[in-house]
Amino acid sequence: MAEDAVVSDAVVVSDAMSSVAKGAPVTAQRPVRDDLEKHIPKPYLARALVAVDVNNPEGTKGGRHEHGQKSVLQQHVSFFDQNGDGIIYPWETFRGLRRLGFNLIVSFIVAIGIHTGLSYPTLPTWRPSLLFPVYIDRIHKAKHGSDTATFDTEGRFMPVNFENIFSKNARSQPDKLTLREIWMMTNDHRLAYDPFGWVANKGEWILLYMLAKDDEGYLPKEAIRGVYDGSLFEFLAEQRTKKAHGKQH
């Protein structure tokens, strides 16, 4: 009887820790990592200031990127605040996109789309503004659905959800995504009755792929992490500036 109890307890413990249910094949098709605590202290803890992963447990180091006591989501958009006043206007987003290398047409369409969709939720008043500003201190109000949940509802960074992007979707390379994998991932993230989230999520990932894919057509993990805290934008803009200056000389 005692042996039966031990076996029974072992089964219960095993089931309690299982991330796969045989009756739900999708749980096996999209596995989650169970080893994160070997690499990241408390990977389930939302990080307010830094975007951490197994390769960067302290977040972005070196370079010019500083968190400045802004949430990771605020850092994500601050690159586009050209004058540093805490408010992003459509023309600032347009200029930021141009600095990143997008052409005039794409920059115009994306800037209009972003501010049309995200401005109103961030306004400090119920009255809309025809200038369509985005207030950085309220950017968490503009978080849309059907996403990876790497940002929580307050704009903090969730390491466990970031790592699960790759455990669930990276089939060709463990730390990179193909365009097809991105397309399938954004399909899998779609929530019911959330057309805005469907379009926004897919559009953001396709733009990121266009911006940061490598020579082999993969989107690297480090580039994805960098876009979450905005350090990728700063790096790419700086590289383009150096390249332009090099051509002049």
Curated annotation (Swiss-Prot):
Record text on activity regulation: Inhibited by beta-mercaptoethanol and organophosphorothioates such as parathion or terbufos.
Domain of life: Eukaryota
Tissue expression as described in the entry: Expressed only in developing seeds. Not detected in roots, leaves, glumes and germinating seeds.
EC number of this enzyme: 1.11.2.3
Cofactor(s) needed: heme b; Ca(2+)
Keyword Heme found: yes
Domain EF-hand: 68-103
Catalysed reactions, as listed in the record: RH + ROOH = ROH + ROH
Signal sequence extent: none
Co-factor binding details: Binds 1 heme b (iron(II)-protoporphyrin IX) group.
Keywords: Calcium, Endoplasmic reticulum, Heme, Iron, Lipid droplet, Membrane, Metal-binding, Microsome, Oxidoreductase
Record: residues binding Ca(2+): 81, 83, 85, 92
Single GO term (MF): monooxygenase activity
pH dependence: Optimum pH is 7.0.
Listed InterPro entries: Caleosin-related (IPR007736)
Record function comment: Calcium-binding peroxygenase involved in cutin monomers biosynthesis. Can catalyze epoxidation of fatty acid and sulfoxidation reactions that can proceede competitively, although in favor of the sulfoxidation. Can only use unsaturated fatty acids with double bonds in the cis configuration as substrates. The preferred substrate is oleic acid and is inactive toward ricinoleic acid. Free fatty acid and fatty acid methyl esters are effective substrate forms, but not phospholipids and acyl-CoA. Hydroperoxy-trienoic (HPOT) acids are preferred over Hydroperoxy-dienoic (HPODT) acids as oxygen donors.
Domain writeup: Transmembrane regions are predicted by sequence analysis tools, but these regions probably constitute hydrophobic domains associated to phospholipids.
Family: Belongs to the caleosin family.
Subunit text: Homodimer.
Record-given protein name: Peroxygenase 1
